Amino acid sequence: MREVLVVSESVELAEEYYLSFNKFSSGSTSLLGQVTKASFFSSLASSGTKSLNTKSFGLKSLSLKSLNTKSSGLKSLNTKSSGLKSLGLKNEFDYLTFEQVKSSGLEDERYELILVVCDDTDDFYGEKGLANLTLFHNSLLPNGKFVLAVPLNSPHEEEMRKELMYSGLVDVASCAYYLTKFITGVRPNWKAKGDRKSSSIHAAPIDGYISKAPDYESCSTKPRACANCTCGRAERENLNSTDSNANSTDFNANSTDFNGVDLTTNSKDVSGVDLVVDVDAPTSSCGNCYLGDAFRCDSCPYKGLPAFKPGEKVLLE
C-alpha cells in the first residue's frame, strides 16, 4: 500500500486533491514522476470525474481561504456519499493540518507522496521555509515525491523552488493551471554526507619495506675492542695510538740528544735527578704523560713523577 500524506486546512479539500492526483497516476504518466502542464491537466479534463470541474479548478476550488464548498463541488467528495471506491481510489492517505505537522512533527522516511495545499506561502521560503521543507523532506522515502500547491499569483515562486533544493530535494519543477501553481521535488535515494565504505585496498605494513637494523653491540665492558667493533672504541684506540707515535721522539742509544746529554749512561741534571733512558718504558695511550701530572690521566703509570722528555723515565734517588 502506498503511503501518502495530504496537508491542508480541510479534509474535503485534501480528498479532492488526492482524488485528482490518484486519477492522474492511474494513467501512463504520473504527476509523482515528471510533472508537465499539458499531460497533467489534459488527464484531469479527460478523467470523466464529475466532481472535478476543470473550468472551476482555480483558486476558489483550490485556495484555502477562499474555499467555497457550495460552488466548488466539494460536497460530492464527502467521504460518506462520494463513492470514492467506485472511482477506483484504492489507496488510503493520511490527513493532517499544517499546524498539526508543525506541532507534532512527522515520522522519518514514511511517505511516498506528500501533498501540501497551502494558501500562505510565507511558511515555505526563508529560514522558516527551509525548516518546514526539511521536515517534509525527511518524512519522504527515497525517491518519494513532494508536491506543493500554492496560488498562481504567489510572488515567491522562485524563492520556494530554491528552498526545495536547499532542503535536499532534486528534480524541482513547477506547472500552472488557471490560478494554481504546483511546485514539485523528489527526495534522492542517496544521503548527503552518507556513510562511505572504506577502501578495500590495504597498504602493506611499513615494516615490510624497511629492513630491521642489527642489534647494537658494545665492547665498553671488554678488555679490548671487538674485531667487528661498532661502538667506536676501535677507532678511538687507533687514533690515540697514532697521536702517541707522532708525539714520540725516535732516539738512538749510541747518540747524544737533549742538549748534549749522553743517553747511554746515567747522568744527573742540575736538580740531582738521574736521567736514564728506559727503552722498555710503558707506551702512553694519550701521549701527554711526559708533560706532567696536570696533563696525565687518573690511571697514568707516571702519576706523581716529574715531567720528562719523551723517551725518558725519571728515577728518583
Curated annotation (Swiss-Prot):
Annotated spans, Fe-S binding site A: 219-231
Keywords in alphabetical order: 2Fe-2S, 4Fe-4S, Cytoplasm, Iron, Iron-sulfur, Metal-binding, Mitochondrion
Region (N-terminal SAM-like domain): 1-192
Region (Fe-S binding site B): 286-300
Motif (Cx2C motif 1): 286-289
Residues annotated as binding [2Fe-2S] cluster: 219, 226, 229, 231
Residues noted as binding [4Fe-4S] cluster in the record, renumbered to the chain: 286, 289, 297, 300
Pfam family, one: CIAPIN1
GO-annotated biological processes: iron-sulfur cluster assembly
Motif (Cx2C motif 2): 297-300
Region Linker: start-end pairs: 193-216
InterPro entries xrefs: Anamorsin (IPR007785), CIAPIN1 (IPR046408)
Domain of life: Eukaryota
Subunit structure: Monomer.
Protein function: Component of the cytosolic iron-sulfur (Fe-S) protein assembly (CIA) machinery. Required for the maturation of extramitochondrial Fe-S proteins. Part of an electron transfer chain functioning in an early step of cytosolic Fe-S biogenesis, facilitating the de novo assembly of a [4Fe-4S] cluster on the cytosolic Fe-S scaffold complex. Electrons are transferred from NADPH via a FAD- and FMN-containing diflavin oxidoreductase.
Family: Belongs to the anamorsin family.
Protein name: Anamorsin homolog
Source species of the chain: Theileria parva
